[in-house]
UniProtKB/Swiss-Prot annotation:
GO terms for biological process: amino acid biosynthetic process; aromatic amino acid family biosynthetic process; chorismate biosynthetic process. Its cofactor is a divalent metal cation; NAD(+). This is 3-dehydroquinate synthase, chloroplastic. The keyword RNA-binding does not apply. The lineage of its organism: Eukaryota, Viridiplantae, Streptophyta, Embryophyta, Tracheophyta. Homodimer. The modification N-acetylalanine is found at residue 59.
């Protein structure tokens, strides 16, 4: 293995993860995750598989997997996935109706001043409920809010300044708490504002989309876009907690629902083959918003994300593998225009391109290529980039990707059986060129 290659292996858990039936959850098997191998060669990080060393899910006697989500659940036992970062660890709460339980949110509010950052689509639906949850029985807390325009094209410095304007005009001090109420764009912008305002204030994530609930709200990546590339300006800044109220998905547009599934599918491809097999059996249930299926997918995705972040918070190696399809996908978003495609749509097409390149390199079996294409089509996601994307556009945009090191473009590619991937710059450039020519104009 080359020195600039990181390999992530998957060990299949027990083979009896049955297909989802009705509204009863299938109890999940043990999940196996990678750790750094003691046998690594000098200059090489080799990752092998081991069982998850500590439980990241704290729930009541009955796990969320084993019961219908629409049952009334006690607030004393929500499903909790822990992001283990030492003294900066925080919980991800998962369940239905969590915004109705003010004590769960209030325990993570610091100080008496709160700024809720949301957008003009989410505000009419959940802003009042969130303010009520923050202030109910707690008259000493005052809440300000700033409502931003919705969409990826507004994830920029001009829009970010509106958050700072509101915070400064409201004279918020260092003991205030910022609350991100919305999808990935709001979470990224609010988190970056919290990281920057007065050199850092507390913040809470309340994600309202599948995309944000399974991926962007977890792990502390915050930031904004630049006209030359996506997420080029930002910081790693962890929240106090992530509160996933699955009831917020009831108002999510179908296109946004499908977009979020691209990130769910990603986890199965790079590190959790058994989860991918479950997805193949249950993708229609997820699209239909079956509450039990969604709860399982969200929990399992968060477990995977939390484990990776706990091992590699600042994306020095392992965490980069979570970007399968994102290098191609970010190029699509930048080249086609921010907001023209949803993030998950671009990632889906980018994933197909990464899988195609992996196959051209001889690293995966053709059956994996077919399975990836099939599940993305069933998920109502695109499998090719927009026709306007050209080879030169891909190359020029990918040249400024965050994963470029010393002028070398490093990619996340599949290698070996399903559930295995590498983060590497050691690949035949002709395979990349062939993939770009196959999916875009010369």
């Amino acid at each position: 293995m080359a020195a600039n290659t990181i390999s992530l292996s998957n060990v299949a858990a027990s083979k009896n993860l049955n297909s989802f039936q009705s509204r009863a959850f299938i109890a999940p098997p043990t999940i196996f995750f990678p750790v750094a191998s003691a046998k690594s060669k000098p200059g090489e990080l080799s990752l092998s598989s081991t069982t998850l060393s500590r439980s990241r899910v704290r729930a009541g006697a009955s796990q969320l997997m084993n019961e219908p989500l629409n049952d009334q659940r006690s607030i004393s036992s929500p499903t909790v996935v822990e992001v283990d970062l030492g003294d900066r660890s925080y919980p991800i709460y998962i369940g239905a109706g969590l915004l109705d339980h003010s004590e769960l949110l209030q325990r993570h509010v610091h100080g008496k001043r709160v700024l809720v950052v949301t957008n003009d689509r989410v505000a009419p639906l959940y802003l009042d409920k969130t303010i009520d949850a923050l202030t109910r029985g707690n008259p000493n807390v005052t809440v300000e809010s700033v409502i931003l325009p919705d969409g990826e094209k507004y994830k920029d410095m001009d829009t970010l300044m509106k958050v700072f304007d509101k915070a400064i005009e409201s004279r918020l001090d260092r003991r205030c708490t910022f609350v991100a109420l919305g999808g990935g764009v709001i979470g990224d912008m609010c988190g970056y504002a919290a990281a920057s305002y007065l050199r850092g204030v507390n913040f809470i994530q309340i994600p309202t989309t599948v995309m944000a609930q399974v991926d962007s709200s977890v792990g502390g990546k915050t930031g904004i876009n630049h006209r030359l590339g996506k997420n080029l300006i930002g910081a790693f800044y962890q929240p106090q907690c992530v509160l996933v109220d699955t009831d917020t998905l009831n108002t999510l547009p179908d296109r946004e629902m499908a977009s979020g599934l691209a990130e769910v599918i990603k986890y199965g491809l790079i590190r959790d083959a058994e989860f991918f097999e479950w997805q193949e059996k249950n993708i229609e249930a997820l699209l239909a918003r079956d509450p039990a299926a969604l709860a399982f997918a969200i929990k399992r995705s968060c477990e995977n994300k939390a484990d990776v972040v706990s091992q590699d918070e600042k994306e020095s190696g392992l965490r980069a593998t979570l970007n399968l399809g994102h290098t191609f996908g970010h190029a699509i978003e930048t080249g086609f225009g921010y907001g023209e495609w949803l993030h998950g749509e671009a990632v889906a097409a980018g994933t197909v391109m990464a899988v195609d390149m992996s196959y051209r390199l001889g690293w995966i079996d053709e059956s994996i290529v077919k399975r990836v294409n099939k599940i993305l089509v069933r998920a109502k996601l695109p499998t090719t980039p927009p026709e306007s994307m050209t080879v030169s556009m891909f190359k020029s945009i990918m040249a400024v990707d965050k994963k470029v090191a010393d002028g070398l473009l490093r990619l996340i590619l599949l290698k070996g059986p399903l559930g295995n991937c590498v983060f590497t710059g050691d690949y035949d450039r002709e395979a990349l060129d062939a993939t770009l020519r196959a999916f875009s104009k010369s």
